[in-house]
Amino acid sequence: MNNWKSEQVIIVGGGIGGLAAALALARAGIASQVVEQAAELKEIGAGIQLGPNAFWMFERLDLVAPISALAVFPDNLIMRDSITGEEVTRIPLGAAFRKRFRQPYALIHRADLHRVLLDACRASSLIGLDAGQKVVGVDDKSGGVAVTTESGKTYRGAALIGADGLWSTVRQIVVGDGKPKPAGHITYRAVLPTADVPAEYRWNDMAFWAGEKVHLVLYPLRTGELYNLVAVFHSNRYEEGWDSYGDPAELHERFAQTCAPVRMLLDKIESWRMWVLCDRPPIKDWSKGRITLLGDAAHPMLQYLAQGACMSIEDAVCLADKVVAAEGDYAAAFLAYQQARYLRTGRVQIMARVYGEFYHATGVAKELRNMMLGSRTADDAMAGMEWLYDVPKELMQEISPRARGEIAREASA
């Protein structure tokens, strides 16, 4: 191991992005120390969607097998009108989709994905993991970086990665732009045992009912043991943070005009978790010397393209590649990393906002949306996804010949 690789990188944040960064660095032989504020290294939330771009990164991290074992691979992505209940559009996610993108589309419980990453990190001698450590100070003036926590503990390393999410402490040191911006949308999430879902709605699909100013998502998790429900509506009500109990009465009021299947599914849930959706405008500079940001700390995005976790995992792999290329010159590596990422992540941030309004359209705009989507072929739909699901070439170039061979065989099957 080269000497520069043995000097650890400090990673603030033990969520999906932080653990992916630690693992990507470890795969390159670089030591890291993860510092997590929560008392326990675990993930809060329910289901998330994984596009083909995420699976290319899982190839890089040698995680395809354990993630695939816990994921659901849906047959279709289906959008229905939330008022009439009629199907608007359907995108098959089977053989043609896999052939086009050479990877699948999957659904997984957030906690399961986090556990796979955590297990891989625990198995590496190059990764340290500490929970219950809230960062209160950073010093990057002494040829390295020192991170101080509320408990009085100090961590020293060659560089610092802030992967501490939407409410990032490290971002305020690097960017200093205050609190994130509420989007005017509120999300309620819950999971439902499959036995409680009526048989006619036990689809192996990523299904959602869209607009007006609301939408409901339904899809299976944990090999069909659970169904994930996500209900979103417009509201200017604001609560800081994102993990609190929701009010079923508020939800039913907002969805009162929706079709019977939507209202029936909402009635099945007694307890919801609620948070206010927030994001930030895209920026191109999220590094400062030996400190950089990753994932939601760098480019928080709304959920409407289902890319928050995917982008953070892409970030992790790209960042590790740039560190290796710079041979430990972290300031140069971090500038190269943000240069490689800011246009792609900024586009996702902007388009996620656009899709949020698109899904929640009302009146004539809703009719035009349904007409446009209803006239698309599956090929049209997939062509429109290429910018999102095709991984940047520089990340593809590092995939091993063995992995390339396995992917090619699967795509041609």
List each model region and its residues.
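Conserved N-terminal helical subregion
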Residues: 2-9, 26, 51-193, 236-254, ...
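Conserved mid-domain beta->alpha element of the FAD-binding
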Residues: 10-39, 161-162, 188, 218, ...
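Conserved N-terminal glycine-rich FAD pyrophosphate-binding loop of Rossmann-like flavoproteins
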Residues: 40-56
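Short, flexible helix/strand-to-coil boundary loops that buttress conserved ligand/catalytic motifs
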Residues: 45, 61-62, 71, 91-92, ...
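Acidic/histidine metal-binding catalytic segments
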Residues: 69-72, 256-271, 330-335
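A short coil-to-beta-strand element that immediately follows conserved catalytic motifs
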Residues: 181-185, 202-205, 260-276
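Active-site substrate-recognition segment that forms the wall
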Residues: 204-239, 244, 248-250, 255-256, ...
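C-terminal lid/capping helical subdomain adjacent to the catalytic/cofactor pocket in oxidative enzymes
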Residues: 299-300, 317-325, 360-413
